[in-house]
Structures are given as C-alpha cells and as structure tokens.
Amino acid sequence: MLDYIPLTATAGRRLATAELRALATSRMEDLGYAYVGNEFSPANSGVRFDVVGVSKYTRQVRIYEIKSSRGDFLADDKWERYLPYCTHFAFVAPAGAIFRFELDRAVGLIEYGAPAFERMRRARRFGMTVLREDCLRATRPSRRIRDAVPDEQWIALLETIALGNRPGASDPSYEEGAGI
C-alpha cells in the first residue's frame, strides 16, 4: 500500500541544498519523528544520511536523501547502501530533477517547487525493546536489516540518533522520551 501525503509548494524558484535540507527536516518533524538529525554518519558504516529521523511510537526510521539537481541524482551511486538502515527512504529534490519511473516502488520522492506528493510504500516494521537504562536493543529486526547491518552497529545507530543527536541536550531519561 502506498501513502500519498500532499506537500506545500514553493513554486517558481530554484532551491539550494541547505534550503531543501531545512524543508526535509521540518517535514520529518511535522510527521512526528521525535529524533531528527542532519548529516548523520553511523560509526564505522561508511555512509552519511542527509536527514534521518526515528519515530518514538511507530518504531520507524526514515531517511531523506537531498538532491539539489538532476546531475546530483545521476552522479549518486551510494544511496542503495542506506536502505538497510531504514524502514522508509525518500529523495528530496526540486520538481523535475528526478522522475518517478527512475525509482524503485519502495523509494519515495518528495518534490519541492511544484504541487507534489510523497509516495512511500509501507515497509515491514521491526520490534524493539527499550530498557530502563536508556539502551536500545533490536529484538527482531527485519531480515533486510539483520543481513546487512551487524546488531552492534544497528544499536549504536539508534542510540546515537535517540540520545546524542540533539544540540545542547544531555542524555534524556526514559520518562523524558528516550525510548523509541
């Protein structure tokens, strides 16, 4: 099943990468993702996510890859390495930079600068257990994640996003929402 979520347009002007990143971050926060990070790189992974968010209640990890132009999209050959880390993945680009037929059905596309829709296929969710010590443990990750990412690396990713990726914030307690 696909979700169609209308976005507001910023019609008629070219958008810079920083502006696209700010729009994507704002969009993710509007969707209710409690922990949102920019330019995030999990330890020892060799990848860097433009915008990543972890939902506190639905146990979803969403990654947005920012593409400022068609050339930027065509030159990118690393985005498929991001898929094992998330339940939802989408490109964020100016309208017309990426064509829907160029993407796999499981990959979303958010276009700014024209009436646009985010198109996302629902991904299977995985279970987690949140311990009182504010430690996240993957209990039953999806097969895709289990095959591609070692458990220690997955736990470190979630800990970093949930606990250490908010500027000026100390480690929150369980009651303050450290659990996902």
Predicted stretch roles:
Residues 2-32, 36-38, 101-180:
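Non-catalytic C-terminal interaction segments of nucleic acid-processing enzymes
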Residues 15-24, 61-63, 68, 76-78:
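Accessory alpha/beta interaction modules
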Residues 28-30, 57-58, 83-85:
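Flexible, charged surface loops at secondary-structure boundaries
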Residues 37-40, 93:
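Short loop/edge segments at beta-strand edges and connector loops
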Residues 41-45:
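A short beta-turn/loop motif at secondary-structure boundaries
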Residues 47-49, 105:
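Short beta-strand or tight-loop elements
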Residues 49-63:
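Active-site beta-strand-loop-beta-strand hairpin of nuclease catalytic cores
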Residues 68-113:
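Catalytic cores of nucleic-acid endonucleases
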